[in-house]
A protein has these predicted regions:
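Structural preference for solvent-exposed beta-strand-turn elements
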Residues: 1-162
């Protein structure tokens, strides 16, 4: 079915007045936060909406050593990356705990493999649609040189050879 609207007519009788604050795109912010992990200096995102995925990325980024400051009122988020693999290793159990109820960990794999040479994908949560396999992600990561170091019931560990 194709919808082709060339004209939109609105008949109203009541003028609208006031102001509305519109926050940023909900699907962009978590990905922008993950991309900021690749940097070596702080990244500032503005107009950030208050979303559960922002919270999940914040927690996972902090467990990987990044510092995240988020002012919900102003919508300003500053993420300062830390490329220390020992922080992630110390927090592996918490990463597993927080990662399992979201699809966000798969987004973090690329930056983590690039910066600290290892990444863990816990068994991922999903949605009402059902299972969403990650084979195509794993195949792409293998083509970039990643190795599956461990694959068990709790998830997958990937590494980049030195």
């Amino acid at each position: 079915m194709t919808l082709n609207i060339s004209k939109l007519r609105i008949d109203g009788g009541t003028p609208l007045k006031g102001q509305v604050t519109v926050r940023g795109a909900k699907n962009l912010v978590p990905k922008a936060m993950v991309a900021a992990l690749l940097g070596s200096t702080p990244s500032v995102l503005r107009n950030v909406p208050d979303l559960s995925d922002v919270e999940v990325v914040t927690i996972l980024a902090e467990l990987h050593g990044a510092k995240v400051d988020y002012d919900r009122e102003t919508g300003v988020l500053t993420l300062t990356p830390d490329h220390n693999s020992q922080t992630a290793e110390r927090n592996a159990k918490d990463i597993q705990l927080f990662g399992g109820n979201s699809r966000i960990p798969i987004l973090m794999v690329g930056p983590l493999l690039h910066t600290i040479k290892t990444a863990r994908i816990p068994n991922l949560g999903g949605c009402k649609i059902g299972d969403r396999p990650i084979d195509y992600h794993l195949n792409a990561l293998r083509k970039f040189g990643a190795n599956v170091a461990k694959d068990d019931a709790s998830g997958i560990t990937l590494e980049v050879p030195e």
